[in-house]
Amino acid sequence: MSLSHDDVRKIAHLARLAVSDADVEAYARSLSSILDFVEQMEAVKTDHVAPMAHPQDTAQRLRDDAVSEADQRERFQSIAPAVEAGLYLVPKVIE
């Protein structure tokens, strides 16, 4: 799959990335080669391959879930720019 320069600019815009005109060609080649590789992987027949949850089939010993740090929520929220009902308020970044 070959991406055009306009495709790269659109992807960069959607991802909120600044891409210079000098870099568009290199990004188009790199992204196109990645998409070509994905197409090759999709062509592989995996109908009879059992799905794996994890490549190593071993049991993990888990440690006890114990509090190891003091609760400093009030201290951290006192220095935060904006807090409401115990939650941190941040600027909207997604339109």
From Swiss-Prot:
GO BP of this protein: glutaminyl-tRNAGln biosynthesis via transamidation; regulation of translational fidelity; translation
Keyword Nucleotide-binding: yes
PANTHER family: GLUTAMYL-TRNA(GLN) AMIDOTRANSFERASE SUBUNIT C, MITOCHONDRIAL
Known function: Allows the formation of correctly charged Asn-tRNA(Asn) or Gln-tRNA(Gln) through the transamidation of misacylated Asp-tRNA(Asn) or Glu-tRNA(Gln) in organisms which lack either or both of asparaginyl-tRNA or glutaminyl-tRNA synthetases. The reaction takes place in the presence of glutamine and ATP through an activated phospho-Asp-tRNA(Asn) or phospho-Glu-tRNA(Gln).
Assembly notes: Heterotrimer of A, B and C subunits.
Similarity remark: Belongs to the GatC family.
Protein's name according to its UniProt entry: Aspartyl/glutamyl-tRNA(Asn/Gln) amidotransferase subunit C
Organism in which the protein naturally occurs: Thioalkalivibrio sulfidiphilus (strain HL-EbGR7)
UniProt lineage: Bacteria, Pseudomonadati, Pseudomonadota, Gammaproteobacteria, Chromatiales
Chain's gene name: gatC
